[in-house]
Amino acid sequence: QGVDPNIHKIDKPQITPIATNRDKSSEFLAAIQAAEVEAVQPVFVDYASDLSVGKMKQDIEVLYKQNTTNGLFSLYYVYDFGTTTDPAFGIASDYFDLLGTDTQSLQEIQREFYDLACSFGIHAGGERIYVTISGLAENMDKAVKLAEEYMQNVEGDDAVLAQLKANAMKARNDAKLNQNANFRALQQYTFYGPEAIRARTLTDEQLMALTSDELLARIRSLSDYEHYVMYYGPETEAKLSAALDAIHRTSQELK
């Protein structure tokens, strides 16, 4: 690309040598070095004893571990399918993150979660989709209700969707000019072949043809699918199951 003649060189400053004292040590360091430390023994997870497996309504499996350290909880709804099964789920989850409902803006919903000291999100991975709710355990019921109402009542915005599509198209075009991205694509092609890549990736035409209703239907339909629940928090297993039976929305018959 040539040499820029406008670049001005700056003289390097003189570096003052630092006298080291590697042969000396403080009393504090000497005490630490002289202390005998017991070797740390490895600890392995035993799923039979470290986790409890229970059931809630609709025969949904609940993986439970009590948090005895603090008053925080993490709750996951895990669906055994993802963008490998339906690549549009990735776009749907990104779109959902930018929307409000017919009665609340996105900022108002975020403020409600903030006031509850809780967070909520939907992550669409290749093999699984995770709905995550976490935060202060005393507000779990309110946070779950807010999250599930948000999922069912989310309202589309065509302007937001158009910008999301434009960003996705730009990212695709930028990736074509990125050597590392091309190497990764070639690696995926070598591992899985062209048909697998086509099945996992929306074409430009498919991406641009997606509608707001199609994408949000995927979010709303999660309550219709089989899934399992993972919980880590201070609530007892019995109280957790009772709470989930009362507040977790599911269809009468899961797909």
Regions found by a protein language model. Give the residues of each.
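Proteolytic maturation boundary segments
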Residues: 1-80, 87, 216-217, 225-255
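Acidic/polar surface patches and capping/hinge elements
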Residues: 207-210, 214
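A common structural junction motif
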Residues: 148-158, 246-254
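Low-complexity, intrinsically disordered regions enriched in charged/polar residues
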Residues: 22-26, 31-34, 158, 177-181, ...
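M16 family metallopeptidases and their MPP-like homologs
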Residues: 1, 63, 69-97, 101-153, ...
